[in-house]
Amino acid sequence: SKNLNRIFYNLKFNNNKSNLKEKLFEIKFKHLFFYFIKKYLLYFLNKINFFKKRKASLWSLHIYNYSKNFIKKINIKKSTKIESPKNAEWADPFIFSYKNKNYVFFENNDLNLNRGKISFGELHGNDLINIKDILKFKYHLSYPFIWKSKNNFYLIPETSEKKSIHIWKAKKFPSQWKYFKTILKNEFCCDTTIIKDKSNNNWLLTNKSNDSSNDPNNELYVYKIIGNFRKLIPHKLNPVITDCRTARNAGKLLIPNKLFRPSQINDSTGYGIGLNINNIDKLNLDSYEERTVKRIFPYKIPNTDGLHHINNSDKHIVFDVRYII
């Protein structure tokens, strides 16, 4: 009987062992199967994105005349394209009204050098005239944010290549500027914007990269401005946003009794594919809260695949659109 029990035990053990091997094989096979599916699916998706990226594309400025409540009623299809020279790409427009004239400041990218400079022009109807260069260096410039404080005009372009934020002050607005100050030295900052809250506090919002990737799309940093840039107090929650789909600044919207922050929509399908209009609900040194109230995509305009900047004056909206050519 002992021998029989031993035989049955060995048979059962070997059978369990065989089942265990089969189960382990099945698990390994499933893991390998899903691994290769994932690997080759990502490969083909990357190939698709690669060919998409190979399509030539250029940013262009658009102008749109509006009335009240434009956040709800904006129709970019009604906008007018501002034609740029053949060897140039125009983007990141900011519009400023001064002495009954409207001036548009923008990134003027020289396609021969692939380097941006800061230019401006006077709005005449739906076109820009008297275009002049105001900042031009051997490094890239973009996002010419204009800020007025106590009758002084300041220009804060994107100068991430220099790993600092350079501020310029107008000697004679809008055409003559002099260097004023450098802030956030040794920091890779992009698309710096200043907003004023209901208590008249000024806040600096910028996108930073803190690693070797130099990717500014993922994080938003906030600083309270003391005096005339005498001091910057960092927000306690910095970075207040860590999401490439909503973090990066995309211009400025001036709406009475509202605090909006436009931001770029960046995701796995591409860079600057559209805009978020975010309402800032809470802003102090201890907390930051915003919610997206509208998204704007360029697809109503034929042959486009991007829209990543917006700004307004009392009667006009300017934005940029990326055309597939």
Give, region by region, the residue ranges found by the protein language model.
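Conserved anion/nucleotide-ligand pocket segment
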Residues: 1-29
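Carbohydrate-active catalytic/glycan-binding domains of CAZyme proteins
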Residues: 1-4, 32-325
